[in-house]
């Protein structure tokens, strides 16, 4: 394809150098708020590019591991400092490339800074335990060693935070990495990797290969010299990645979809519940794995809750995320835009009652982007498609229930188990919910979306491979335990 000279081309990062794909092919990254705006051109890489990156990572791993954890952490501190200096540019790029508001993009980039600093500190923490031995002359202890080369396959919805929360622990524990960012946000990823480059990481320790999931992603999952694969994305692709890694004996970590419920008890603070439902379900255009999708409301407060919800959603401004007044931006890509619209049509055709939104936004400049109105359905049956499948868009399904017990039972009627929330003033309701809800992330009087980097994150059932990311739990995936017995 012919490249416009005024638009920058971004390259793969292999062995400390910015390089073109051996294919010499690039593809445009499109601004979803204005499909005529090309953010940049990114590489369409091949398996040969993957092989080069893995070779570089493999050759660098031993010397990287021989450095102390404290020294490895110093590189993360440097990267954090540079990322913070570049916050405005990276956030603006993220907004142009993915569509979320600039405020959200800034917050996410700052989250990346905090994650890097957190894991920099982990380089000085313990990596084992002393265990009493039954032999009075023996010393029994454990230590941890890195996996080796880790493949990181990251999604487009958090193009700064998710790659960093995977790469930072991998690196501080002595692994080298090959990042495959989502094609939709590869320009943002390149700017993040530039921060690692400027931080002076040794050649081969950090690598990035851009391209399709079917070529680059699957190439990473299948590669015999990649010792671990950490993936965030759809269930369909995640299962393919996990299967490929399992078949060759590599360690794998999958964070996938969600169909996250909110329960609104009859004693709830309805204003708080409405704000949490809207923020959890509609911010970032509902494109979060922890986004609210199903809302179970006790019958006694259903009508007042619905009225407040509709009143509030009418106040939301839809527009370009670079506009300071915008509350909700576009769907991140044309394909996601059409996916969301198709789910809305399924909801209507299967008998759910559309009470708000449901249309493409065609007013003024919105017609140039992939904008969908916030959409609310009621009279939703649990067997309807919109109540069962992850939509990844600004769509809420309202469901009346007669009790908290019924709400929990219905909320658990899904293959997913990522995040769940309850709004209540009754501690008994909260404790029952915490005990019985099938989710890895549980919120009380707070929205389903949002995680804290210092705490373990992951789901149950089909939402996860049952491992956990972030916090000190990250060491469990990115290292292996050695048990050592020493005889005096």
Swiss-Prot record:
InterPro entries attached to this UniProt entry: Ald_DH/histidinol_DH, Ald_DH_C, Ald_DH_CS_CYS, Ald_DH_CS_GLU, Ald_DH_N, Aldehyde_DH_dom, AlphKGSA_gudD
Gene Ontology terms, MF aspect: aldehyde dehydrogenase (NAD+) activity; aldehyde dehydrogenase (NADP+) activity
Pfam families reported in the protein's UniProt record: Aldedh
Residues that bind NAD(+): 233-238
Domain of life the protein comes from: Bacteria
Gene Ontology BP, a term: ethanol catabolic process
Pathway(s) the chain acts in: Alcohol metabolism; ethanol degradation; acetate from ethanol: step 2/2
EC numbers for this chain: 1.2.1.5
Principal EC category: oxidoreductase
Reactions that this protein is recorded to catalyse: an aldehyde + NADP(+) + H2O = a carboxylate + NADPH + 2 H(+); an aldehyde + NAD(+) + H2O = a carboxylate + NADH + 2 H(+)
Entry keyword set: NAD, Oxidoreductase
Temperature dependence: Optimum temperature is 55-60 degrees Celsius.
Record-annotated active site: 255, 289
Stated role: Oxidizes several aliphatic aldehydes, particularly c6-aliphatic aldehyde and hexanal, but does not oxidize benzaldehyde.
Subunit annotation: Homotetramer.
Sequence similarity: Belongs to the aldehyde dehydrogenase family.
Protein name: Aldehyde dehydrogenase, thermostable
Native species: Geobacillus stearothermophilus (Bacillus stearothermophilus)
């Amino acid at each position: 394809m012919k490249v416009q000279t005024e638009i920058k081309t971004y390259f793969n990062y292999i062995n400390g150098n910015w390089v073109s794909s051996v294919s010499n092919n690039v593809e445009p990254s499109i601004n979803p708020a204005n499909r005529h705006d090309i953010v940049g051109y990114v590489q369409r890489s091949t398996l040969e590019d993957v092989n080069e990156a893995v070779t570089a990572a493999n050759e660098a791993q031993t010397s990287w591991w021989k450095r102390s954890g404290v020294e490895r952490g110093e590189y993360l501190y440097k990267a954090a400092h540079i990322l913070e200096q570049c916050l405005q540019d990276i956030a603006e790029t993220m907004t142009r490339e993915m569509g979320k508001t600039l405020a959200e993009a800034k917050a996410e980039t700052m989250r990346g800074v905090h994650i890097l600093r957190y894991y920099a500190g982990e380089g000085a923490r313990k990596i084992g335990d002393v265990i009493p031995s039954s032999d009075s002359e023996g010393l029994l202890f454990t230590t941890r060693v890195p996996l080796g080369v880790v493949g990181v396959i990251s999604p487009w919805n958090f193009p700064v935070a998710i790659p960093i929360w995977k790469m930072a622990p991998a690196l501080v524990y002595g692994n080298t990495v090959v990042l495959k960012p989502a094609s939709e946000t590869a320009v943002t990823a390149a700017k993040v990797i530039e921060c690692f480059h400027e931080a002076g990481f040794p050649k081969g320790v950090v690598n990035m290969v851009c391209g399709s999931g079917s070529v680059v992603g699957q190439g990473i999952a299948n590669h015999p010299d990649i010792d671990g694969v950490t993936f965030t994305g759809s269930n369909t692709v995640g299962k393919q990645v996990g299967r490929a890694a399992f078949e060759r004996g590599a360690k794998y970590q999958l964070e996938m979809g969600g169909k996250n419920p909110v329960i609104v008890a009859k004693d709830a603070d309805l204003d708080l519940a409405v704000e949490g439902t809207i923020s959890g379900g509609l911010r970032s255009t509902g494109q979060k794995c922890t986004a609210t999708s199903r809302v179970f409301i006790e019958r006694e407060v259903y009508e007042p809750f619905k009225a407040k919800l509709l009143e509030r959603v009418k106040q939301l401004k839809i527009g370009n995320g670079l506009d300071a007044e915008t509350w909700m931006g576009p769907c991140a890509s044309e394909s996601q835009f059409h996916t969301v619209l198709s789910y809305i049509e399924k909801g209507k055709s299967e008998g759910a009652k559309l009470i708000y939104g449901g249309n493409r936004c065609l007013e003024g400049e919105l017609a140039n982007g992939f904008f969908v109105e916030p959409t609310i359905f009621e009279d939703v049956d649990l067997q309807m498609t919109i109540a069962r499948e992850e939509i990844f868009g600004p769509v809420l399904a309202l469901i009346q229930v007669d009790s908290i017990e019924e709400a929990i039972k219905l909320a658990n009627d899904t293959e997913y188990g990522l995040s769940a929330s309850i709004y209540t003033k009754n501690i008994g309701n909260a404790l029952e919910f915490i005990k019985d809800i099938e989710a890895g992330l549980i919120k009380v009087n707070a929205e389903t979306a949002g995680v804290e980097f210092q705490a373990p994150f992951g789901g149950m059932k089909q939402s996860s491979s049952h491992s956990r990311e972030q916090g000190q739990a990250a060491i469990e995936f990115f290292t292996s335990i050695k048990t050592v017995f020493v005889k005096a």
